[in-house]
C-alpha cells in the first residue's frame, strides 16, 4: 500500500471504512432556486457540468454567474472562449472581476482542450468554463476543404479529452463547466428529436446536466427587458435529479435576485400575497410583482433578511 501511495500519491488507494464521506464542496450558481434544485447548494467541485439549451436561452449568463460567485469566495477562474464572443462588459455587470479572469481564445478544439487540461492540472484555478462544445472544431476540419466529410471527428476529440479531464478535475477539485448547443436529429418521428453536439461522451462524464430554456418575455411597456427562464436538472450524481428552478434573466443585468426573493418568498409563505399586493410582516412591498421586485431591489437590508429566511425554509424542505 505504501509503495502504491508513493508512486501515485496519497489517497490513490484506501479502505472504504477509512475515509469519512465529507459534505460536497460547491460553487454557488448565482440563483437561490437553482442552488436548491441542485440539492447541494451549487455546482459540485471536482466534477464536470454541462449546461445546454437553445440559442439565447441564458447558458453563458449562467456560467458567468458561477465565475462571479467563485471569485467572490476568493477563487480563481478561467474562460475558454472557443466561440470568440466573450463580452467583458456584460461579465463585469454580472459581478465578474474581469481583470483577474484568465481567458483563452483558441484556434481549434485540440488547443482549447489542451489548454483546459493544463490549467486544471496546475491546481491554480477553481472553476473553468468552456464556451462552447459546438465551437470546438477539430484541427483536421479547419485545415481541410469546405466540402470534406469529417464525420465523428469532434465526438472522438471530446471522448479522448473527457477521459483525461475527469480524473484531473477530481484530483484538483476544479469545477469544469461545458456550455453546449442543441441540434435536431433528422428523421426522428417519435420521441425527442433534440440532441446536444459533440457526441455522447459529455452526457456520460458530466456529473450534472442542466437544460435551460427561456419561457415568457418580460416587458416594460412595449420594450422587452428580460425573460423568464426555466432550468431542469436532467442529470445529477450528487443529489436527486429532475428538480426544476425558475428565475428571471434581465438583459444587461443577469439573474434577477429580487425576483427570486419575491417568487420563493411567496411560494414558501414568507411573503404574503393578498390580491395583487405583496407584503412581509406589516410592510407592504408593492402592488404587483414588478413593484414588489423594485422595493426589494431598493432595500438591500430587507433583501438580505428575506434571503436568510428563504435559505432556512429551503433547508427544512430538503
UniProtKB/Swiss-Prot annotation:
Entry-linked Pfam families: RecA (PF00154), RecA_C (PF21096)
InterPro entries hit by this protein: AAA+_ATPase, DNA_recomb/repair_RecA, DNA_recomb/repair_RecA_CS, P-loop_NTPase, RecA-like_C, RecA-like_N, RecA_ATP-bd, RecA_C_sf
Taxonomy, superkingdom: Bacteria
Compartment(s) where it occurs, according to its Swiss-Prot or TrEMBL record: Cytoplasm
Residues in coiled coil: none
Single GO BP term: DNA repair
Presence of the UniProt keyword Acyltransferase in the record: no
UniProt KW ATP-binding keyword: yes
Binding site for ATP: 53-60
UniProt keyword terms in alphabetical order: ATP-binding, Cytoplasm, DNA damage, DNA recombination, DNA repair, DNA-binding, Nucleotide-binding, SOS response
Molecular function per GO: ATP binding; ATP hydrolysis activity; ATP-dependent DNA damage sensor activity; damaged DNA binding; single-stranded DNA binding
Gene Ontology cellular-component annotations: cytosol
Function of the protein: Can catalyze the hydrolysis of ATP in the presence of single-stranded DNA, the ATP-dependent uptake of single-stranded DNA by duplex DNA, and the ATP-dependent hybridization of homologous single-stranded DNAs. It interacts with LexA causing its activation and leading to its autocatalytic cleavage.
Family of the protein in this entry: Belongs to the RecA family.
HAMAP family xref list: RecA
Protein name: Protein RecA
Origin species: Bacteroides fragilis (strain YCH46)
Lineage per the UniProt record: Bacteria, Pseudomonadati, Bacteroidota, Bacteroidia, Bacteroidales
Gene encoding the protein: recA
Amino acid at each position: 500500500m505504501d509503495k502504491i501511495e508513493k508512486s501515485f500519491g496519497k489517497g490513490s488507494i484506501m479502505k472504504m471504512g477509512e475515509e469519512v464521506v465529507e459534505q460536497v464542496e460547491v460553487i454557488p450558481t448565482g440563483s437561490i432556486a437553482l442552488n436548491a434544485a441542485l440539492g447541494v447548494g451549487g455546482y459540485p467541485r471536482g466534477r464536470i457540468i454541462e449546461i445546454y439549451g437553445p440559442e439565447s436561452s441564458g447558458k453563458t449568463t449562467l456560467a458567468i454567474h458561477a465565475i462571479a460567485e467563485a471569485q467572490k469566495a476568493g477563487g480563481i477562474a478561467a474562460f475558454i472562449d472557443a466561440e470568440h464572443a466573450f463580452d467583458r462588459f456584460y461579465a463585469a455587470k454580472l459581478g465578474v472581476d474581469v481583470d483577474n479572469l484568465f481567458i483563452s481564445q483558441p484556434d481549434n478544439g485540440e488547443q482549447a482542450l489542451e489548454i483546459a487540461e493544463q490549467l486544471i492540472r496546475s491546481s491554480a484555478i477553481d472553476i473553468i468554463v468552456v464556451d462552447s462544445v459546438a465551437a470546438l472544431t477539430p484541427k483536421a476540419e479547419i485545415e481541410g476543404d469546405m466540402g470534406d466529410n469529417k464525420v465523428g471527428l469532434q465526438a472522438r476529440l471530446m471522448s479522448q479529452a473527457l477521459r483525461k479531464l475527469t480524473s484531473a478535475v477530481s484530483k484538483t477539485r476544479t469545477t469544469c463547466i461545458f456550455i453546449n448547443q442543441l441540434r435536431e436529429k433528422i428523421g426522428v418521428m417519435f420521441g425527442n428529436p433534440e440532441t446536444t453536439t459533440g457526441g455522447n461522451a459529455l452526457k456520460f462524464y458530466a456529473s450534472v446536466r442542466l437544460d435551460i430554456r427561456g419561457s415568457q418575455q418580460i416587458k416594460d411597456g412595449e420594450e422587452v427587458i428580460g425573460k423568464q427562464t426555466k432550468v431542469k436538472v436532467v442529470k445529477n450524481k450528487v443529489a436527486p435529479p429532475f428538480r426544476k428552478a425558475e428565475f428571471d434573466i434581465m438583459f444587461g443585468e443577469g439573474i434577477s435576485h429580487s425576483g427570486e426573493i419575491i417568487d420563493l418568498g411567496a411560494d414558501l409563505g414568507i411573503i404574503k400575497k393578498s390580491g395583487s399586493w405583496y407584503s412581509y410582516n406589516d410592510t407592504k412591498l408593492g402592488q404587483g410583482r414588478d413593484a414588489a421586485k423594485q422595493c426589494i431591489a431598493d432595500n438591500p437590508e430587507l433583501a438580505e433578511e428575506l434571503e436568510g429566511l428563504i435559505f432556512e425554509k429551503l433547508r427544512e424542505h430538503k
